[in-house]
UniProtKB/Swiss-Prot annotation:
Pathway: Cell wall biogenesis; peptidoglycan biosynthesis. It catalyses: di-trans,octa-cis-undecaprenyl diphospho-N-acetyl-alpha-D-muramoyl-L-alanyl-D-glutamyl-meso-2,6-diaminopimeloyl-D-alanyl-D-alanine + UDP-N-acetyl-alpha-D-glucosamine = di-trans,octa-cis-undecaprenyl diphospho-[N-acetyl-alpha-D-glucosaminyl-(1->4)]-N-acetyl-alpha-D-muramoyl-L-alanyl-D-glutamyl-meso-2,6-diaminopimeloyl-D-alanyl-D-alanine + UDP + H(+). The keyword Cell wall biogenesis/degradation applies. This is UDP-N-acetylglucosamine--N-acetylmuramyl-(pentapeptide) pyrophosphoryl-undecaprenol N-acetylglucosamine transferase. It comes from the Bacteria. Cell wall formation. Catalyzes the transfer of a GlcNAc subunit on undecaprenyl-pyrophosphoryl-MurNAc-pentapeptide (lipid intermediate I) to form undecaprenyl-pyrophosphoryl-MurNAc-(pentapeptide)GlcNAc (lipid intermediate II). Belongs to the glycosyltransferase 28 family. MurG subfamily. The keyword Cell division applies. HAMAP family: MurG (MF_00033).
Length: 379
């Protein structure tokens, strides 16, 4: 990195999925602009998402997910977490960070536990409306909690919680400058479908099946961009080719914010990063929460946007191809409704979340309390 800081080192710890890493990337960008040297502690899954960090600033920490009750499996898990704790201590002794910030996921447990035990100030950011298990386990130990969709003034840790919103990456802020323009009745209708950074098998089956049920003149208007898991990519692409519908299908799009800005309608899961980007860019959406989420966090995230009038929320179990086709046809023809949804979504977006979170991070790094931060006593 060619503009290393004089403020000191801050380590960001995040699980290796886009939902955890994208807000970490956004905070890193803001902190670097303020003169901080920012490092990332993560797991091996993160390689395709960490382009915003120099290679020597990415540190893979051993970790494991706590799942099931098998004694042997649990023993292996706790052994991995202990090894991660040792990895983290060694890293922190070398880097001497002034703050460690966790973004959720089990890979954050070793760095945050190590930091708190070493007397290094700690902060966690919870993206969702319901606190995840890893953050829940850390909430009592850290100096401060930043919330994306957490309800304000609720829960046992309200006194040390600050609602900052979810930081979004620079390309999202660039895309947010593109105003929403409804498709004309005879125009191509650009549909964006994605299931978060890990894709969604359900969409790869359900969307082509629904498109097949549309009247031919409606099908002819569609231009589809769809994220699909690698194992579903070929079958989804073939389904659209058979229907004569132009479709760009891939496991991952590096330019997803630009594609969202270009879309007339979005069908997506409702992870926190997804919902945050939809609101900052301001696009009408149908949200289908992942039904197997242990904490039902996606349902809570979706409900927050639906309450503002910015999205329709449909349970996956209720979304037959027939119903999906009806909702898609309605979206293609109720252009005024989509325009109102886009405005409602944008009205609840927080494009300044990275700045607010960076303000909090600097305050905690300097030794200030959350109460002092809330009272305006900032660095």
């Amino acid at each position: 990195m060619d503009n290393l800081a004089n403020q000191g080192v801050i380590v960001l710890a995040a699980g290796g999925t886009g939902g955890h890493l994208f807000p970490a990337e956004a905070l890193a960008h803001e902190l670097r602009a303020r003169g901080w040297d920012v490092h990332l502690a993560t797991d091996a899954r993160a390689q395709r998402f960490v382009g915003a960090f120099a290679q020597d600033h990415v540190h893979v920490i051993r970790s494991a997910t706590i799942a099931g009750r098998n004694p042997v499996a649990l023993l292996k898990t706790f052994w991995s977490l202990w090894q991660g704790n040792l990895d983290s201590r060694k890293l922190f002794r070398r880097l001497k960070p002034k703050l460690v910030v966790g973004f959720g996921g089990y890979p954050t447990l070793p760095p945050l536990y190590a930091a708190s035990n070493m007397g290094i100030p700690t902060l966690i950011h919870e993206q969702n409306a319901v606190m995840g298990r890893a953050n829940k386990g850390l909430a009592g130990r850290v100096k401060a909690i930043a919330g994306g969709f957490l309800p304000e003034n609720s829960g046992a840790y309200a006194a040390k919680t600050v609602i900052t919103g979810n930081p979004v990456r620079s390309p999202v802020l660039v895309a947010a400058a593109t105003p929403y323009t409804p498709a004309g009745k005879d125009d191509r209708f650009r549909l964006l479908v994605f299931g978060g950074s890990q894709g969604a098998q359900f969409f790869s089956q359900a969307i082509p099946a629904a498109v097949a049920l549309l009247p031919e003149h409606e099908r002819a208007r569609l231009l589809i961009t769809q994220q699909a898991r690698k194992e579903d990519e070929a079958s989804a692409r073939q389904a659209y080719e058979k229907l004569g519908v132009p479709a760009d299908v891939a496991p991952f799009f590096n330019d997803m914010p630009a594609r969202m800005a270009d879309a007339h309608f979005v069908i997506a899961r409702s992870g926190a990063s997804t919902v945050s980007e939809i609101t900052v860019i301001g696009r009408p959406a149908m949200l289908v929460p992942f039904p197997h989420a242990l904490d039902h966090d996606q349902a809570a995230n979706a409900a927050a946007l639906a309450a503002a009038g910015g999205a329709e929320v449909v349970r996956q179990a209720d979304l037959s191809p027939q119903r999906l086709a009806e909702m898609l046809q309605s979206a293609m023809n109720e252009l005024e409704r989509l325009e109102q949804q886009a405005k409602a979504a944008k009205s609840v977006g927080k494009p300044d979340a990275a700045r607010l979170l960076a303000d909090l991070a600097e305050a905690i790094a300097s030794g200030k309390t959350v109460q002092e931060f809330k009272e305006g006593n900032r660095p």
